[in-house]
Swiss-Prot record:
NAD(+) binds at residues 290-304. Signal peptide: none annotated. One of its GO terms (cellular component) is cytoplasm. This is tRNA uridine 5-carboxymethylaminomethyl modification enzyme MnmG. Its main location: cytoplasm. The gene is mnmG. NAD-binding protein involved in the addition of a carboxymethylaminomethyl (cmnm) group at the wobble position (U34) of certain tRNAs, forming tRNA-cmnm(5)s(2)U34. Belongs to the MnmG family. GO terms for biological process: tRNA methylation; tRNA wobble uridine modification. One of its GO terms (molecular function) is flavin adenine dinucleotide binding. InterPro entries: FAD/NAD-bd_sf (IPR036188), GIDA_C_N (IPR049312), MnmG (IPR004416), MnmG-rel (IPR002218), MnmG-rel_CS (IPR020595), MnmG_C (IPR026904), MnmG_C_subdom (IPR047001), MnmG_C_subdom_sf (IPR044920). Homodimer. Heterotetramer of two MnmE and two MnmG subunits. PROSITE patterns: GIDA_1, GIDA_2. It is found in: Cytoplasm.
Amino acid sequence: MQDHHSTNESFDIVVIGGGHAGCEAAITSAKLGFSTALFTINLDRIAWQPCNPAVGGPAKSQLVHEVDALGGIIGKLADKTAIQKRILNASKGPAVWALRAQTDKREYSKKMIEILQNTDNLSLKEAMITELDIAKTEEIGLNSKKIVKKRIKGVRTFFGSYYSARSVIITAGTFLEGRIWIGNKSMSAGRSGEQAAKGLTKNLHEIGIKTERLKTGTPARVDKRSIIFDELDAQPSTAADKYFSFDPNIKNNMPQVSCHITRTTTKTHQLIRDNLHLTPIYGGFIDSKGPRYCPSIEDKIVKFADKESHQIFLEPEGINTPEIYVQGFSTGLPENIQLELLRTLPGLSECKMLRPAYAVEYDYIPATQLQTSLETKEIEYLFSAGQINGTTGYEEAAAQGLVAGVNATRKLNEKDPIIFTRESSYIGTMINDLITKDLKEPYRVLTSRSEYRLTLRGDNADRRLTPLGYQIGLIDEKRWWAYQEKMNLLEEEKLRLNNTRLKNTDEISKNIELDTGSKIKGSTTLKELLKRPNFHYSDLIKYNLTEKNLGSSIQEGVEIDIKYEGYLKRQKNNIEQINRQSCKSLPQEINYEKIDTLSLEARENLNKIKPKNFGDASKIPGVSKADLTALLVWLKIREIKKEKANIFVKKSYHLKSNPSEH
């Protein structure tokens, strides 16, 4: 780096990138009392939602709840700017319930900018960072071997300004040497309409940080005034009263709108097949890996060739914009074919395309180079968070940003880092996966990745993490008081239900038996009653068996705790068993493709590698602890079936060899 005696400003922490990871990191470090500068290429596009204008969904909503429970921002902003909310997987168990909010993307960005501008200790800077300044010192290690230690000193911008920093957090998203593709044409860009970050990748290589290349994409936006809504199924907002944030003061004043559903047709599929050679991937123009769980429409047609139709969602990007996001329809096809393709969908036969779909490839830092704190192993006081670590999604980015922000401040305070474990949070599950597995495709958090998913629910994220948020200093006294009040009410109610009995001779008991079809033998506690699958907390209210008017979140928490008490104990035992089974051999003849309790990714990778034992299987990318649990259960069932078959064979042989017994 050039001579930098002319320092523009000095900061405790510099954050590079103003996306969802960068905003959480910067706000976190500033709230904890450290002078922080957030650098971004475009101050008007802070916390932008360049892909779907939505927050939450399966596992992602659990992450948002966790970030909020710790004192982060994403949940509050999603609640304040939501224009539609739905509960996904509501017919399944609470482990996979997920809140998803359609947000007004411009309002979301606007409110984040307001928060940043009004956060003490935080400065916003529009500049492109191209160099990290590193100090090197030599130390004598074991066997008198010299060790070169590297430590961050500051950053330099494209135009030469220098800022000293005690710690740096890189949250560059898709901007590092980003290139967008439409068909066989490409241009340098971090995302559509914004320049890529140039120079920093080269500098990272020079200081010992490796990068690789990934790809993602986003679908076209169409003008809602050109859509024939009569041909579509409406999907209204059904959970406007549900919140990501545990803060009781968060409210939503946004109008609620509907999304709409359409489907691909045989004409859609044929048009894609006829033009596959024009896409960046199938045409061979790029070979970067895209996200497995958010495939392009051409990937869907190729990989699921037997499927006659795919569901497509039309999602509003905001209240005051005509733009509609065509969810599930990302593509790399040329622009003219994209429009033709869109017009094969019911309701879109006359649509006008406002923005074309495009693919974007970018440099990322494989997270195996990071410690659990998200500090790089190579350079002290240098942290990395968000999509640059190989993840995909605003929620994953926000969670990493908060972790990096917390641990950068703790490093400066010479305190131990906060380590999030798999059993404590989805945040811990994600970070553990990132730093231990050599991932070659964008990582998305999934409920199936967690072996503790019944414990790591969205509704109890505050119980798991708010005490930690308070200890760190991100939860204020008012919020802490509200949390303690909620915990007291929850525990008091569980105790009351355990101590209150009903006799089968009581009039209420007779009514309950009549309504539910389940007998009450002798007497039962309200807790035992609530354990029944066809009895809910709402029934306690119905039969006037409550004492206090408890909030819906407390009612839900009480019911889940009681109903799933046994499952939670069994889950814990399964995990302990897994940890003891690392040397258990795996028969080489197993066809993992036939084990449908495994994730698709796990089946594919296990079949390819054929591990010898559980220990080897646990090291394979894409094989989660949840997959190992499922595999262990499958092997047990297999062994029981074999034992039964052997007993049957022995009995048959015994009968044949003793004909006199007949």
